[in-house]
């Protein structure tokens, strides 16, 4: 079974061979019935998230947060990875500082429960 490449001169023949003269006698809902009957009505009964009020988490976002998201979105992959590395290093350093302070508190006996 050999395949023949179409040459530029027989492009009209190729185009003609792709035409379909099939008549669609029904409306599209009849052609493509719902997979689960009633789902479309159920989904339509809820308000669109676009028209309803913003979610609670969105209402709590401040202008600085939006600016930070825009800044992060504009970073290249390499710059974003560098930013993530910096945050990981900062988190590690904070963990070390917390550990030092907890050890210090233990030695100073400020973390013991008061005796009754």
Curated annotation (Swiss-Prot):
Q: What Pfam families does the database record attribute to this sequence?
A: LIN52 (PF10044)
Keyword Phosphoprotein recorded: yes
Question: InterPro entries in the record, alphabetically?
Answer: DREAM_LIN52
Any Gene Ontology biological process: regulation of DNA-templated transcription
Point out residues bearing the modification Phosphoserine: 28, 53
Q: Which UniProt keywords apply?
A: Phosphoprotein
Q: What family is this protein classified in? A: Belongs to the lin-52 family.
> What protein does this entry describe?
Protein lin-52 homolog
């Amino acid at each position: 079974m050999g395949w023949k490449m179409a040459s530029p001169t027989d492009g009209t023949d190729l185009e003609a061979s792709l035409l379909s003269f099939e008549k669609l006698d029904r409306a599209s809902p009849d052609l493509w019935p719902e997979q689960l009957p009633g789902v479309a009505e159920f989904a339509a009964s809820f308000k669109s998230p676009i028209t309803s009020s913003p979610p609670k988490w969105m209402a709590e976002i401040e202008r600085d947060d939006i600016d930070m998201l825009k800044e992060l979105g504009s970073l290249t992959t390499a710059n974003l990875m560098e930013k993530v590395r910096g945050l990981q290093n900062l988190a590690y350093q904070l963990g070390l500082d917390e550990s030092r302070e907890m050890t210090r508190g233990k030695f100073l006996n400020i973390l013991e429960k008061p005796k009754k």
